[in-house]
Amino acid sequence: MTANGDVRQPDARTYFTHQHPADYHADWKGYYERALVSRARSMERFAHELDIRYGTDPHQILNVFRAADTRSAPVIIYFHGGRWREGHPAFYDHLADTWAADGAVFVSAGYRLTPEHSIADSVADAWAVTDWVVRNIAAYGGDPSRITVAGHSSGGHLASMVALTDNCAVSIVGLVCMSAPVDLRTLGFWDDDTLSPHLQISRVPRRVVVSFGDPEPNRKGDDALRLTREGQMLADSLVAYGASLRTVVLPNADHVRTATAFADRQSPLFGAAHSVIFGDSTEDRSAPRSPHFQEEKQSCPE
C-alpha cells in the first residue's frame, strides 16, 4: 500500500557515494542496487505501507513493515545514514525482513537533508517521526510503549539525539546506535555542542547498544578509526552518566557492513539489538574497549 502525495523518490544516481564508487572502500553503489532487490522481496513477504507523510516536505516520509497478524508488538524506528546529505528509507526497508519475521513493527524514516536544510532540521524531523509513531503505530499493530530508536552513521546520530536528550518528550525503551558521528564539532558541521549527543545526555533508555567497526573503512583517504573513536566516545559518555549498555565491536567491518549487520542473524550486533528491541535479556554486558581508541587517547596532547 502506498500513501498519496508528492514524495521524494529513491534515486541513488544523485548520491556522491554512487557517482564516485572508486573513492570508497565500501561498495555503496552495489549496496543500493542490492537493497532495492531485497526490498521488493520484503514487500512481497510482509504487510507494508509506503511513503506515509509525517510533514509537508517531500523528505518527510516513512515506511512501515510488519507481519499481517502483528499485535502489541515492539517497534523499531530506523534512521538511515548518508552524512545527513543523501539516503532514502527505500534503501533500508530490506532490514525490516528479519525484524518483522521476529514480530516487530519496522518503521524506516526519511528526513530533510543538507545542504537544502540543516542538520538541526534533520534532528527536528527525527523527533517528529517519533511523535508520529507514538500517535499512530497502534493502528499497525505496534505498541507505542515499546519503541526502540535505531540508526546507522548520521542516522545513528539522529537516533541518539532522540533517545538521549529530553528535547523529545516521548518515552523510549531502547537505543541501537551504529557507527555514528556523535561529536559534530570535530566534523566542521556545527560550532556548538547542542547537536552532539554525547555532550547532551539528559536521559537514557533502559536498554542501549552502541556498535562500530574496528577499524571501519569507508572513504579512501579518510581515517578508518574515526567512527571507532566516536562510538567509544559515546559509550564512555553513557558510562560516565551512570548508564548500562552493550558495546558491540565489529572487527574489520567497512561502513556498509556495520549497517547490514543490524539485520544479520549471524552478527553479534543482531543478538545485542534483539535483546534491546524485544527486552529478552536484562543482562548488561559491555564489550572490551577498542585498543585503537586507547592508543589514540594516549597519543593526544593535554
Curated annotation (Swiss-Prot):
Basic and acidic residues bias locations: 282-302
Pfam family, one: Abhydrolase_3
Ranges in a coiled coil: none
SUPFAM superfamilies the record matches: alpha/beta-Hydrolases (SSF53474)
Family annotation (InterPro entries): AB_hydrolase_3 (IPR013094), AB_hydrolase_fold (IPR029058), GDXG_lipolytic_enzyme (IPR050300)
Function: Involved in the degradation of the Pseudomonas aeruginosa quorum sensing signal molecules HHQ (2-heptyl-4-quinolone) and PQS (2-heptyl-3-hydroxy-4-quinolone) to anthranilic acid. Probably catalyzes the hydrolysis of N-octanoylanthranilic acid to anthranilic acid.
Protein name: Probable N-octanoylanthranilate hydrolase AqdA1
Organism name: Rhodococcus erythropolis
